[in-house]
């Protein structure tokens, strides 16, 4: 599917419309926030099937995995905020020092303004829309930037958002690096980014120009430590599940194992068994085996096979 791209000239216009909408006070009332959260929940339920179908087209992600790892997490977040937004927004009393008597102290939470949310491709529904829940709950507006590597999902999300919220409140902007650059040239009141450390640095540098607060959820490496006293069969099943979920394209998936030398052979045997139980003898035929997102990622993973000994598997099929 061809990538949809927003006209770069519209980015500043959308940003200005959202700032004006926020300053009008339209997002501030807690009852309005709760109503928007309820509308968001209804939208996710309405668009659940198209979202899951798009995840299948882009990533070969099964309905079961799409629901468990994406949609259900989003719905849970929305429902938590619906239940608690009233409590979270109430002023909180704090002790007042004697020197300030007879004054009283409170913490009053106020929305920052317009937020930019940039998400990656590996969990394109959850990682883009879960931060939006916080935006709505806090009384802000938002521009959402989905990944260009999952065009089907990005298009469905854009349609869902347009069907649910006005552009001056929540908008979706699509495109490649030039669009990212144009977005980061704008002044935002909050930036929420999930992705690579290299692009995270660019986000941080752009935010620093205006002292914009940022949340950076960056990728890394996740070791899994298995001691000689561990239940080998259970540990192997958990590692296999964690590494096969989303084909290992998860920031908290086990990246490498640190095993006690006395259990290495037994563990590897149990791990192979666990993978076969999950995906069968030919994972390509499994409906629950997600595909690698693009050619560059495939070639990078293929290169790992040359760096060590292949214990089992090791076949590639581009």
Language model features with spans:
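Rossmann-like NAD(P) dinucleotide-binding subdomain of oxidoreductase/dehydrogenase enzymes
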Residues: 98-234, 272
């Amino acid at each position: 599917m061809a990538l949809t791209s927003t006209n770069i000239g519209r980015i500043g216009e959308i940003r200005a419309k959202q700032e004006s909408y926020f300053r009008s006070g339209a997002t501030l009332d807690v009852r309005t926030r709760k109503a928007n959260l309820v509308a968001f929940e209804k939208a996710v339920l309405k668009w659940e099937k198209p979202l899951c179908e798009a995840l299948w087209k882009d990533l070969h992600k099964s309905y079961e995995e799409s629901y468990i790892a994406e949609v259900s997490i989003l719905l849970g977040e929305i429902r938590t905020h619906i239940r608690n937004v009233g409590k979270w927004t109430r002023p909180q009393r704090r002790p007042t020092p004697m020197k300030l008597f007879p004054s009283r102290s409170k913490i009053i939470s106020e929305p920052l303004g317009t937020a930019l949310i940039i998400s990656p491709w590996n969990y394109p529904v959850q990682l883009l829309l879960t931060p939006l829940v916080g935006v709505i709950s806090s009384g802000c507006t938002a521009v959402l930037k989905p990944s260009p590597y999952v065009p089907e999902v990005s298009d469905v999300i854009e349609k869902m958002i347009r069907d649910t919220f006005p552009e001056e409140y929540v908008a979706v902007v699509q495109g490649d690096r030039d669009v990212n650059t144009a977005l980061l040239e704008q002044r935002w009141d909050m930036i929420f980014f999930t992705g690579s450390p290299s692009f995270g640095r660019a986000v941080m540098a752009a935010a620093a120009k205006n002292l914009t607060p940022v949340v950076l959820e960056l990728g890394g490496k996740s070791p899994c430590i298995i001691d000689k006293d561990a239940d080998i069969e259970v540990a192997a099943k958990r590692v296999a599940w964690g590494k096969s979920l989303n084909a290992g394209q998860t920031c908290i998936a086990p990246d490498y194992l640190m095993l006690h030398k006395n259990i290495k052979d037994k563990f590897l045997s149990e791990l192979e068994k666990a993978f076969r139980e999950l995906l069968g003898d030919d994972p390509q035929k499994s409906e629950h085996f997600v595909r690698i997102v693009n050619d560059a990622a495939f070639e990078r993973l293929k290169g790992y096979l040359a760096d060590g000994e292949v214990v089992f598997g090791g076949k590639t099929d581009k």
